[in-house]
Every structure is written in structure tokens, then in C-alpha cells.
Curated annotation (Swiss-Prot):
This is Bifunctional protein GlmU. The keyword Acyltransferase applies. InterPro entries: Bifunctional_GlmU, GlmU-like, GlmU_C_LbH, Hexapep, MobA-like_NTP_Trfase, Nucleotide-diphossugar_trans, Trimer_LpxA-like_sf. Its EC number is 2.7.7.23, 2.3.1.157. Residues 247-455 are annotated as: N-acetyltransferase. One of its GO terms (cellular component) is membrane. The active site is at residue 359. Acetyl-CoA binds at residues 376, 382-383, 401, 419, 436. The gene is glmU. Gene3D superfamilies: Hexapeptide repeat proteins, Spore Coat Polysaccharide Biosynthesis Protein SpsA, Chain A. GO terms for molecular function: glucosamine-1-phosphate N-acetyltransferase activity; magnesium ion binding; UDP-N-acetylglucosamine diphosphorylase activity. In the N-terminal section; belongs to the N-acetylglucosamine-1-phosphate uridyltransferase family. In the C-terminal section; belongs to the transferase hexapeptide repeat family. The lineage of its organism: Bacteria, Pseudomonadati, Pseudomonadota, Betaproteobacteria, Rhodocyclales.
Length: 455
């Protein structure tokens, strides 16, 4: 089977410079969701028909394994599919999808493909309590589909029909080529409707069959930011349901955002308002506090993330404790049992087992050994305005509060750095290193006093 995805619309109601099909659902362009569904069907070929903002669309999805066809100007859905025909092969079946219908399910599409067989025309239809705005499915007395009428061209009786066309269909490529060549635009919109091929199929004796989706929301399109937000919530709720079915405890399923791929082990708990972006892997028995943001990370078993922690491009070992208000940036690797407390930031650093930085520290471009204590207010001075340098700290080091380590510098195994030290040279193993001004007290010193007005 071959797939045609119509993605040429402007989306004026979006009121956005971003092409409609690039508007995001769960952190990915809507069109990317549709392409993923087509790929899951193992389609022989995927052709995307683009138009408005075509350069931006192609640039954003340049790595997708698709072919591109330009529709310019946009003269309706039939005209759009016509642009894809040079990429299609007679003898195959063609599935028509839409770049602004991002939640279409693969099981539904498989049933539609099966219904079409190798020679029938299969339509995906739904029955709506309020069918306003949709093309109506018209059937004869025996229940056979005879044609589709768009609402603007429908009579009063036809508008009362509740079964509507979703636009998604499967048809033989050879017949599709013939039907599209004969399309006219004698309608209220002066456009070439893809739906007109149904009447042609019926006239030629081609069987037209219909399939209902597993859920109506699969067929919902997006034409406004309000509809975009509605589908976002639907999608997130579906993700939350799948997570809970897999054993994840969500404190409130309506307050989680997954904008990528989230893989969870057993007995994972996730509090409210957490955001997961990219690929996130969470091992067994992990607890994630409220309002955390986790992006492209692997969280080790038994780890605890306290509220308001941000974890990005990070790998943690087992039984780590992070936060509250901690941040790990790209390139961070934590061993087992590492503690990062409130207002600790780590970037491009490796911290080995059982080391701790419990509060108010910046660790950048550093390699820290086992069982190291990083005191409050400690920073690695890794940037000289032009280049960045690394700090290396051995096992069993104790770093006093308010210490600055000016890289490149090494702290030997078992060393102690006194509070307030500014370390500019390597600190030897198993020694106390202190670098600060000598403390003095001045007897009789008087604090300056402000002069009063008139004095």
C-alpha cells in the first residue's frame, strides 16, 4: 500500500506564521504524527502534498523517509491528491490521510486497508450528534453508499444525515488516477472535491465500503488553537491511561505532559504537573515529585526527584536523590546514591557513587570521585571568558562551604578544602588546603555614622 498525506493547507484560523501541519501535538508537529502512523503500516511509499509554507514544512521534516509533491495553488482535496499521482504505482492501493488529523490510529487504518481489499473503495466514516460542517454519507434503500455531499451543497434533508465523511479513504491507484482526471469543480467552492470520486465509483460498479474508527477522536482535525489544545489534552489523557495500564501511579492523570517517549519500570510514581520531553527511561521504584521537567534522561532504580527539579540529557545511577529545585544539564552522569540538593546545578560532569552536593552549588565540567562532600556555595570556575576547563576531584574529598575551584585544577584523594578557599593550584592528597585572607580584629574601631541634616 502507498500513502498520500495532504498537508498543503494554510490554517488561517491558527493566526500563526507557522504552517498548520507544523503546529505541535505532544511536542511534535502534527504532520510527524501522521507520518509515523503511515510508517507503522509499513507503507511502500509515503507522499506528502505540501503547499503553504512548503519550504518550512520540508525543512522541519527533512529526515522523514517521504516523497514530496507541491500543490500550488490549492484547489481542493481532489486537486491535492492529483499532485501525488506521479509518485504512485498502478496496481497498488492508496491510503489518503491528512496532516491536520494527527491522532488517527494504526489499528483503525489496518481495518480500513483490510476492508478495501485489492479492488474496493473503503471510506472511514463516523456518526456525529452534530454533523455540522462535514460532508454527509448518502446511502440508498439497501444501505449502500451512493455519494458524499458537502454541507454547502447539501439539501435540508441531506443535512439531517448524521453519518459523515472523515476524508480518509483507501482506493486502487489505477482507478484513482482515472477518477481524478475526470473531476469537475461545479460546486459552491469551485474546488475539486476528492469526495466526488465516490459517485464515479458507484456508477462504474465499484463496491464502496465503510469502516468506523475505534474512537471518534481519531478523526478530529485541527483548524484553530482551541482545537489544537483540545487534541493535546485528548492525546495526553490517552498517554496517561496507557501508563496507568502499565502500572505507573499518576497522582492526577489530567496533569501530566509527555512530549516524546516515556518508558517506565515497575512501581513508578509521578506527581502532578510533570513534563517529559524526548526519550525518558525510568527504572523501577522511582518517585518523581510535582512540577519536574525531565528531558532525554535515564533515571536509575530507586531514585527520588523532589519537586521542581529539572533533569536534561542526564543519566543517574540507583538510589539517587535530586532536588528540590535542582538542575542537571546536558552531559551529566550520576553514580549510585548521589545526592543533589536544593539549588544545585550540574553540567557536563560525572559524579561517582555516594557523593553529595546538598545545597547551593554549581558543578560544571567536573569529574568527582566517590564519597565526596561538596559544601554549600561551592562552584567550579570552569570558564575564563574564552575556553572551558575541567576540575578533577578524587575520592573521599571534603570541600568546605563557599569554595571556588578555578579550573583546570585537581584535588587529590582524601583532601580537605577549608571553607572560603579559592583554589588555583592542585590540592595534595590527604592534606588540608586553605586559601583565604588572614582574619584580624581591630580594637576600638568605630562604624561610620550618617550625618544628620544641618550638620
Amino acid at each position: 500500500m502507498e500513502v498520500v498525506i495532504l498537508a498543503a493547507g494554510q490554517g488561517k484560523r491558527m493566526r500563526s506564521a507557522l504552517p498548520k501541519v507544523l503546529q505541535p501535538i505532544a511536542g511534535r508537529p502534527m504532520l510527524e504524527h501522521v507520518i509515523a502512523a503511515a510508517q507503522a503500516l509499513e507503507a511502500r511509499r509515503i507522499c506528502v502534498v505540501h503547499g503553504h509554507g512548503g519550504e518550512a514544512v520540508r525543512a522541519r521534516l527533512q529526515h522523514a523517509a517521504v516523497q514530496w509533491a507541491l500543490q500550488q495553488p490549492q484547489l481542493g482535496t481532489g486537486h491535492a491528491v492529483l499532485q501525488a499521482l506521479p509518485h504512485l504505482t498502478d496496481g497498488d492501493m492508496a491510503l489518503v490521510l491528512y496532516g491536520d488529523v494527527p491522532l488517527i490510529g494504526v489499528p483503525t487504518l489496518r481495518r480500513l486497508e483490510a476492508a478495501a481489499g485489492g479492488e474496493r473503495l473503503a471510506l472511514l466514516t463516523v456518526e456525529l450528534a452534530d454533523p455540522s460542517g462535514y460532508g454527509r454519507i448518502l446511502r440508498d434503500g439497501a444501505g449502500r453508499v451512493v455519494r458524499i455531499v458537502e454541507e454547502k451543497d447539501a439539501s435540508a434533508d441531506e443535512r439531517r444525515v448524521r453519518e459523515v465523511n472523515t476524508g480518509i479513504l483507501v482506493a486502487p491507484v489505477a482507478r484513482l488516477r482515472d477518477w481524478l482526471a475526470r473531476l469537475g469543480n461545479d460546486n459552491a467552492q469551485r474546488e475539486y472535491y476528492l469526495t466526488d470520486i465516490i459517485g464515479m465509483a458507484v456508477a462504474e460498479g465499484v463496491e464502496v465500503t465503510t469502516v468506523q474508527p475505534d474512537a471518534i477522536w481519531e478523526t478530529l482535525g485541527v483548524n484553530s488553537k482551541a482545537q489544537l489544545a483540545e487534541l493535546e489534552r485528548l492525546h495526553q489523557r490517552n498517554i496517561a491511561t496507557r501508563l496507568m495500564e502499565d502500572g505507573v501511579t499518576l497522582f492526577d492523570p489530567s496533569r501530566i505532559d509527555v512530549r516524546g517517549e516515556l518508558l517506565c519500570g515497575r512501581d513508578v510514581e509521578i506527581d502532578v504537573n510533570c513534563v517529559f520531553e524526548g526519550r525518558v527511561e525510568i527504572a523501577d521504584d522511582v518517585r518523581i515529585g510535582a512540577n519536574c521537567v525531565i528531558r532525554n534522561a535515564r533515571i536509575g532504580a530507586g531514585t527520588r526527584l523532589a519537586p521542581f527539579s529539572h533533569v536534561e540529557d542526564t543519566t543517574t545511577g540507583r538510589d539517587c536523590v535530586i532536588g528540590p529545585y535542582a538542575r542537571t544539564r546536558p552531559g551529566t552522569t550520576l553514580g549510585d546514591g548521589v545526592h543533589l540538593g536544593n539549588f544545585v546545578e550540574v553540567k557536563n560532569s560525572a559524579i561517582a557513587d555516594d557523593s553529595k552536593a546538598n545545597h547551593l552549588a554549581y558543578i560544571g565540567d567536573a569529574d568527582i570521585g566517590r564519597r565526596v562532600n561538596v559544601g554549600a556555595g561551592t562552584i567550579t570556575c570552569n570558564y575564563d571568558g574564552a575556553n572551558k576547563y575541567r576540575t578533577t576531584i578524587g575520592d573521599d574529598v571534603f570541600i568546605g562551604s563557599d569554595t571556588q575551584l578555578v579550573a583546570p585544577v585537581r584535588v587529590g584523594r582524601g583532601a580537605t578544602l577549608g571553607a572560603g578557599t579559592t583554589l588555583t593550584k592542585d590540592a595534595p592528597e590527604d592534606q588540608l588546603t586553605v586559601s583565604r585572607a588572614r582574619q584580624i580584629s581591630i580594637p576600638g574601631w568605630k562604624r561610620p555614622v550618617k550625618k544628620k541634616a544641618g550638620e
